[in-house]
Amino acid sequence: AKKEAEKAEKLRAAGVQPQKKKAVGSKFFNDLAGLMGDEFMKRGATLHGCDVRTRDAFANMDIAGYNYGIYRYKHDLKKYPNRLILGSETFCNDAYRFREQAKKNPRLVGDFVWAGMDYLGEVGVGSWEYKAYATQFSGLGWTTAGSGRIDLNGRPLGEALYTRVALEQEIGPYIAVRPVMFSGEKHSPSAWKMTDAMPSWSWAGCEGKKAHIEVYARAAKVALLLNGKKVAEKQLKNDCLAKFTIPYQSGTLEAVSYDAIDRVLGRCKLQTAGADTVLRAVPEEKKTKPGRLCYIRIRYTDRAGELKPMERGMVNITVSGGKLLAAGSACPFHPGSYLTPETDTYYGEALAVVEAGES
């Protein structure tokens, strides 16, 4: 692998584009799903051959694991009355549907959304990336899948909030906003990405642009307020997600969720960051011991600590009293190294991993 990487780097330095290999096996189907959408995978799982190939094996298993089998659950639970089913790999946008089915049938024992956290490999399969962060939508430079509900640096995204509400760990509401500065721009295709929304209302310079807002709530309806004024309201049916599009205006964005008789169930607010910008180093733990790993978030914020996702810059990291082991952003397109002290930021943030020293 090292020799292949060195060869590819030499070709790139010489301006030679490597030959694109034909996708086969899992990569072929992943690429096809990226182009055709998640229905391709879910409809494929309902083909008769899938049942024929698995029924004998499942008859000898304690639990049958289904990949993208949301459309098979109801049928198979009836056809195989002794079968326990686990969603071993599923799409994020099916989490609500799974939960509603599982409440009606306890033989649906669990669901694993792919993927909980981003990871190295299967590069770009779950990424919605824009040209500002990815100079090309395929080829060299991609390092992670981009399909995590939690990004590579450990930051929960809008999809993580949606999943928590869908699986009834919380009732919400939560607000997440798609990057307003990229509104209307094309992004890399993926079936494994439900949304690129994040919990932020800090989009400086985007006044008047379309803001695509998502509210996640277990409720009968949700209302959206901007700077104290109600600007939209939606009923929630067959999902815990309401989508709104309004012109961006800085200030306070609030979501209020209601039950069927208009009682308030919850509130959530996002506040625009102030005009001042500060680069902060924020350790996850205030105290540590020699030899322990310290994860330090490097963030562009205002003076109150509110993240500013539109701020971007190259950061050079120096460490005293410890050893820098790695540094990088969560961007799936990362043509550089995680082993150097210099890193770009991604939506206002990067991460440094430091081994604590004796002092």
Predicted regions and their residues:
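Short hydrophobic/aromatic beta-strand micro-patches
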Residues: 216, 353-355
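Extended low-complexity, serine/threonine- and proline-enriched intrinsically disordered segments
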Residues: 221-229, 312-325
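Non-catalytic helical/linker scaffolds that mediate oligomerization, partner binding
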Residues: 286, 351-352
